[in-house]
């Protein structure tokens, strides 16, 4: 007879969880940041608010964003005028959009990841889906299972309303699943659509306007598993260690509330200060066991909540400008795509590392860190190990 401990030992993988493939997707509608204030104030019938428009123009100019991708087109917004007002009851209209678009965009990213992985989708054992865009039952995980033609007994995990830190959360969960279930192959999908947060401007709520200047739509998908099959599966990054923490004295730093008017976001001005104040402690906890204290010697993937957060983190840790290059590049080309952002940065980094002829997927370096920041204020930390190219 086999003991329980022997069964448990047999269930565990031998090696660390490894990212085996990455796919990304964005809506076709591309919005140039330089002309967005004109479009935004026109479509929301707010052109008479000239001072507010000038403020918004300055926000967009300082955002370090060149372009974003959005499901919401001029045509869709004209058909749904309640979405263009500030705080008008519009949840039904928003839900009708995202319940369809979140799985559709997620599928696009997942198909690319599965293709790169090179294995039949019947080998996917677990599915993690994450979105801050809408809520439904059965959820986006169920819809994706159907859209992709996955087996009905795939083990599903649906994460709704987590916010911008959740790109780290899905990696942490995927790591635990892959390492504790021998042979598991986890499909991770983050899909974000700003149709829930778009609304017209308000003179009294400038934090809402900040969101209108930063957020974009996008999806990212990964295949995660331990003990890659030689010659068939090609590792991209290994996951070494993960943590989640609530920053002290940060309550109300970032809040989101689902209301009749959609999802409202509230930001304190000092979010960059809270993040930079707590980041050193998170790094020491993560890298002291590895004997690493020079944070310029690792590669960096940070959720680009906005340029001010990146600036303060760089300053606090005396990071060289090139450390945040991949992060800033994604912010510039896509805006803040909430949970999908850090996964898109992972993809950009491994591609650029190969293009530049570097030795590893992590800009030629061995170890790196991935940070997610979001409501709470919650900080997710993931230590990554790159793979030789």
From Swiss-Prot:
Q: Tell me what this protein is called.
A: Chalcone synthase 8
Q: What class of enzyme is it?
A: transferase
Q: Which organism is it from?
A: Medicago sativa (Alfalfa)
Gene that this sequence comes from:
CHS8
Quote the pathway field.
Answer: Secondary metabolite biosynthesis; flavonoid biosynthesis
Where do the catalytic residues lie? Answer: 164
Highest taxon listed in the record's lineage: Eukaryota
GO process terms (BP) = flavonoid biosynthetic process; polyketide biosynthetic process
Catalysed reaction(s)? (E)-4-coumaroyl-CoA + 3 malonyl-CoA + 3 H(+) = 2',4,4',6'-tetrahydroxychalcone + 3 CO2 + 4 CoA
Q: Which UniProt keywords apply?
A: Acyltransferase, Flavonoid biosynthesis, Transferase
Q: Which InterPro entries match?
A: Chalcone/stilbene_synt_C, Chalcone/stilbene_synt_N, Chalcone/stilbene_synthase_AS, Polyketide_synthase_type-III, Thiolase-like
